[in-house]
Amino acid sequence: MDIGDFVKLELENTTYSGTLMPSLNENTIVIKMKSGYNVGLDKKKIKNIEILESGDKPKYGLPPLNLEKNPKLKNISILSTGGTVASRVDYKTGAVHPAFTADDLIRAVPELMDVANIKGKVILNILSENMLPKYWAMTAEAIKEEIENGAEGIVIAHGTDTMHYTASALSFMVTSEVPIILVGAQRSSDRPSSDAALNIIAAVKAATEPIKGVYVLMHGETGDTVCHLHEGTKVRKLHSSRRDAFKSVNKTPIAEVNPVTKEVKYLRDVKSRDKSKIKEVVLNTNLEEKVALIKVYPGIDSEILKFYVDNGYKGIILEGTGLGHTPETFFEGIDYANENNVLVAMTTQTINGRVNMNVYSNGRELQAKGVIPCEDMLSEVAFVKLMHLLGNYEFEEAKELMPKNIAGEINESINLEC
């Protein structure tokens, strides 16, 4: 029995048929069923295996491809940090291959040839839950190198779980006249409902636009007619599996991008690039990694805060209830943090709306204890911002800058309800 064979597996009460695939576990047999889904079965539970059809030895062959730069199109670099947004599937085995040479990208998504001149580069190959702050700095350095080598737009392929953290980090780290677009896929490229190809087409299109800044581009609805371009510090993943999981919070998206017609419709004012400074990039990648994000809950113990202080943490983001509150029983821990020069700031776990710690006595008392209100900053953004500030400024200056708008993280509109 070889990889690629079409087999029938008999269990006690049922049978499964499909193409035999590679397995990472020697005790598990994996097959790809005709539905396109993979199933892994415990070898001990399999009563009988029948080879229905012998398969050819799997090959990952590529036809020759002649790529010539189109002088009428912009030069876009696509940097991969991992994920499946532009991977290529060998349907005989189900194996997923990274597709990050220019040739591979065009084969995976040939429509890109009509949008831009593509250069592909792998900088990381990790699951996004394994993203580390040092990788944000590595990504920023790769962006700088590509821009200085002539890239007129950057697309970063990223796993969706922590993409909003990375977008936030790059918003604080990178100052450039080139658009930086993070893109991912909620459905892998071997599934009929995959959003990978359309998202990357729309992201590359957005990267050719005359704008600057860091953005996230993902499906704007469950269908395939529109993708949304979100500001990097005002976006969050709000669903575990839907294709339109990413939403702008307390702001509308920057634009709608039709991945089929390639039309871009701006929904509000954007930051336009200065062509004369197209190769100028300023990086500030210093981060204080001893920062924690703590969700407040009924009965939360001050010992939690004391633990972080005693272990050398320099900053704490509290994701408080409502307008920015904690139980009074938590005040002791906040006093302890303040006495030890640990910067404590407050966001709200409601996600939408803004912190207002002047309404109730609880919030006013927290402010008196040195807790900084973070306006309508998302908790994840406040977490990254505090790492950035403490990595670059002294305590008092960081404390002063925390409630100020640096990279679009605060919506200063007086019309925002809270």
From Swiss-Prot:
Keywords: ATP-binding, Ligase, Nucleotide-binding, Protein biosynthesis
Originating organism: Methanococcus maripaludis (strain C6 / ATCC BAA-1332)
EC number: 6.3.5.-
Reaction(s) catalysed by this chain's protein: L-glutamyl-tRNA(Gln) + L-glutamine + ATP + H2O = L-glutaminyl-tRNA(Gln) + L-glutamate + ADP + phosphate + H(+)
Superkingdom of origin organism: Archaea
GO MF terms, alphabetically ordered: asparaginase activity; ATP binding; glutaminyl-tRNA synthase (glutamine-hydrolyzing) activity
Keyword Translocase tagged: no
NCBIfam families, sorted: asnASE_I (TIGR00519), gatD_arch (TIGR02153), PRK04183.1 (NF003217)
Alphabetized PROSITE patterns for the sequence: ASN_GLN_ASE_1, ASN_GLN_ASE_2, ASN_GLN_ASE_3
Biological process, per Gene Ontology: amino acid metabolic process; regulation of translational fidelity; translation
Role: Allows the formation of correctly charged Gln-tRNA(Gln) through the transamidation of misacylated Glu-tRNA(Gln) in organisms which lack glutaminyl-tRNA synthetase. The reaction takes place in the presence of glutamine and ATP through an activated gamma-phospho-Glu-tRNA(Gln). The GatDE system is specific for glutamate and does not act on aspartate.
Domain Asparaginase/glutaminase: start-end pairs: 74-405
Assembly and interaction partners: Heterodimer of GatD and GatE.
Enzyme active site: 84, 160, 161, 237
Family: Belongs to the asparaginase 1 family. GatD subfamily.
Protein name from the UniProt record: Glutamyl-tRNA(Gln) amidotransferase subunit D
UniProt-listed HAMAP family: GatD
